[in-house]
């Protein structure tokens, strides 16, 4: 889809970046000369702007050999960064997609700066193209032709084409993984059960040569996975514990464990959600989608790392056999849990998922979950809540998130918080000791299962979906944290290795 070339005959549509400068230079100047000074005139008259994210379409004379040029404003070069490059590309590719253009050429060198070298510019181009042109897969009865997609982008550059192609490959892998996560989250709950999610994981494993294990209900019963089994009690759909292993090293050591909450639909159980609160609960497997999206990116890029993916998956339904408030269950870890809120089910399945990941070699753990409404109240819909038991490992996760442009904010875990989750008179832990600090209580609960293993909890309840379209795509699922997890897996270094 993305091709690094030194010149291209595919110039019916061309994309050019414009920095805010006193005069045109480099490739932009060459375009101006080809247009016989027309670009300079358009800039003076304000019909074309170099201001950030401004996209201007110009229809050049036939002598130019192309039908249209998209100029995108990059702002001042001194302020231009990798993240800004992604935003600029997103705006222009969204315009191209809206115009239903299936092929375009991009003058990559007009997007390069001292802080954004060729490979990074190429990465930004490919990732943003895929994110910006993503469309929600709906189920409407249509008689019109299928939507036209961008099929080929010819990236014209005077730089090393192998280096540029490598950057395009990375960006494409990140864009594809994120879009796959989006598609999973957008799917209706009746079309994406735990069984369907397991089948998807098996297909991913076959494509990328991952080791795959799907634990069935009977196996969970033998192992004593009381958390996921309790949540599944009210459902007619069988639960699945989905396990994928990617081994990029000779030995199974220094393993990054990724645990994703896979609740395919959440009614709240007997602590039932309100009419407005229950709509959209198909997205309660956003953590699982993020982990699977990251695994797709990892499969494409093949880093020299070991990654373990664990997804406990079921729906949370109501029936005569469903779990009830006041029930006491025994988790895989052996710790007992008093159920005070059946709508606090995500932490129950994650407890078993975290324990299983530890048992199978995870050196560090990241769990990802649409876990609490409390995190939305605290941080809104742009920032993911984070908690940890290890600041050094948290910093690696935070660095990965910053590199990907995905905002996270750390919430505390105090000794008083730990006492609160242990306040049950009937069991080792309570799954919901109160509404105060609800997001923190949920994370603190999970920390009791991570124990001494370095661990970061990411609560994406506010960030997994967007109510409004952005330059990076339509309203709906965002695929948040898929890129962060993939970047973490690529960059991860065990602390003891750093000290050698």
From Swiss-Prot:
<keyword id="KW-0645">Protease</keyword>
<feature type="binding site">
    <location>
        <position position="284"/>
    </location>
    <ligand>
        <name>Mn(2+) 2</name>
    </ligand>
</feature>
<protein>
    <recommendedName>
        <fullName>Probable cytosol aminopeptidase</fullName>
        <ecNumber>3.4.11.1</ecNumber>
        <ecNumber>3.4.11.10</ecNumber>
    </recommendedName>
</protein>
<feature type="binding site">
    <location>
        <position position="261"/>
    </location>
    <ligand>
        <name>Mn(2+) 2</name>
    </ligand>
</feature>
<dbReference type="InterPro" id="IPR011356">
    <property type="entry name" value="Leucine_aapep/pepB"/>
</dbReference>
<dbReference type="InterPro" id="IPR043472">
    <property type="entry name" value="Macro_dom-like"/>
</dbReference>
<feature type="active site">
    <location>
        <position position="347"/>
    </location>
</feature>
<feature type="binding site">
    <location>
        <position position="345"/>
    </location>
    <ligand>
        <name>Mn(2+) 1</name>
    </ligand>
</feature>
<keyword id="KW-0963">Cytoplasm</keyword>
<dbReference type="GO" id="GO:0030145">
    <property type="term" value="F:manganese ion binding"/>
</dbReference>
<dbReference type="Pfam" id="PF00883">
    <property type="entry name" value="Peptidase_M17"/>
</dbReference>
<feature type="binding site">
    <location>
        <position position="343"/>
    </location>
    <ligand>
        <name>Mn(2+) 1</name>
    </ligand>
</feature>
<dbReference type="GO" id="GO:0006508">
    <property type="term" value="P:proteolysis"/>
</dbReference>
<keyword id="KW-0464">Manganese</keyword>
<comment type="similarity">
    <text>Belongs to the peptidase M17 family.</text>
</comment>
<feature type="binding site">
    <location>
        <position position="345"/>
    </location>
    <ligand>
        <name>Mn(2+) 2</name>
    </ligand>
</feature>
<dbReference type="GO" id="GO:0070006">
    <property type="term" value="F:metalloaminopeptidase activity"/>
</dbReference>
<dbReference type="InterPro" id="IPR008283">
    <property type="entry name" value="Peptidase_M17_N"/>
</dbReference>
<feature type="binding site">
    <location>
        <position position="266"/>
    </location>
    <ligand>
        <name>Mn(2+) 2</name>
    </ligand>
</feature>
<dbReference type="GO" id="GO:0008233">
    <property type="term" value="F:peptidase activity"/>
</dbReference>
<keyword id="KW-0031">Aminopeptidase</keyword>
<feature type="active site">
    <location>
        <position position="273"/>
    </location>
</feature>
<dbReference type="InterPro" id="IPR000819">
    <property type="entry name" value="Peptidase_M17_C"/>
</dbReference>
<comment type="function">
    <text>Presumably involved in the processing and regular turnover of intracellular proteins. Catalyzes the removal of unsubstituted N-terminal amino acids from various peptides.</text>
</comment>
<dbReference type="Pfam" id="PF02789">
    <property type="entry name" value="Peptidase_M17_N"/>
</dbReference>
<keyword id="KW-0479">Metal-binding</keyword>
<dbReference type="GO" id="GO:0005737">
    <property type="term" value="C:cytoplasm"/>
</dbReference>
<feature type="binding site">
    <location>
        <position position="266"/>
    </location>
    <ligand>
        <name>Mn(2+) 1</name>
    </ligand>
</feature>
<keyword id="KW-0378">Hydrolase</keyword>
<dbReference type="InterPro" id="IPR023042">
    <property type="entry name" value="Peptidase_M17_leu_NH2_pept"/>
</dbReference>
């Amino acid at each position: 889809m993305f091709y690094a070339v030194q010149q291209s005959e595919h110039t019916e549509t061309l994309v050019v970046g414009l920095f805010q400068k006193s005069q045109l230079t480099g490739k932009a100047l060459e375009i101006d000369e080809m247009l016989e000074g027309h670009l300079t005139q358009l800039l003076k008259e304000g019909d074309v702007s170099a201001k950030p994210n401004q996209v201007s379409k110009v229809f050049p004379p036939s002598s130019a050999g192309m039908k249209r040029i998209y100029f995108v404003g990059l702002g001042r070069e001194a302020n231009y960064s990798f993240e800004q490059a992604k935003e600029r590309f997103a705006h222009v590719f969204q315009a191209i997609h809206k115009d239903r253009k299936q092929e375009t050429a991009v003058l990559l060198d007009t997007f390069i700066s001292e802080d954004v070298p060729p490979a990074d510019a190429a990465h930004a181009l490919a990732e943003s193209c895929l994110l910006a042109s993503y469309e929600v897969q709906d189920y409407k009865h249509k008689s019109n032709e299928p939507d036209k997609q961008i099929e080929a982008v010819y990236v014209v550059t005077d730089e090393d084409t192998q280096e540029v192609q490598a950057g395009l490959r990375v960006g494409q892998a990140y864009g594809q993984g994120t879009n796959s996560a989006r598609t999973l989250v957008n799917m209706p709950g009746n079309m994406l059960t735990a069984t369907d999610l397991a089948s998807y994981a098996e297909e991913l494993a076959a494509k990328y040569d991952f080791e795959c294990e799907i634990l069935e209900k009977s196996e969970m019963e033998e192992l004593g996975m009381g958390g996921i089994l309790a949540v599944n009690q009210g459902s007619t759909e069988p639960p699945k514990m989905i396990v994928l292993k990617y081994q990029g090293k000779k030995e199974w050591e220094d393993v990054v464990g990724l645990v994703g909450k896979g609740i395919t639909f959440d009614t709240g159980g007997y602590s039932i959600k309100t009419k407005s609160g229950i709509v959209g609960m198909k997205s309660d497997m956003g953590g699982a989608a993020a982990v699977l999206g990251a695994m797709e990116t990892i499969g494409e890029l093949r880093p020299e790392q070991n990654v373990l993916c664990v997804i406990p998956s079921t729906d949370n339904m109501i029936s005569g056999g469903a779990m009830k408030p006041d029930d006491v269950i025994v988790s895989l870890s052996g710790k007992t849990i008093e159920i005070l809120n059946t709508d606090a089910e995500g932490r129950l399945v994650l407890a078993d998922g975290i324990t299983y990941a530890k048992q199978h070699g995870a050196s560090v753990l990241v769990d990802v979950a649409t876990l609490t409404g409390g995190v939305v109240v605290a941080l809104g819909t742009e920032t993911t809540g984070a908690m940890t038991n290890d600041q050094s490992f948290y910093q690696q996760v935070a660095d990965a998130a910053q590199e990907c442009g995905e905002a996270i904010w750390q919430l505390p875990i105090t000794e008083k918080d730990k006492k609160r989750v242990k306040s049950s008179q009937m069991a080792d832990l309570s799954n919901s000791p109160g509404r105060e600090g609800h997001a923190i209580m949920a994370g603190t609960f999970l920390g009791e299962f991570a124990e001494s293993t370095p661990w970061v909890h990411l609560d994406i309840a506010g960030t997994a979906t967007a109510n409004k379209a952005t330059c990076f795509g339509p309203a709906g699922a965002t695929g948040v944290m898929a890129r962060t997890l993939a970047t973490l897996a690529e960059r991860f270094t065990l602390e003891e290795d750093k000290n050698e």
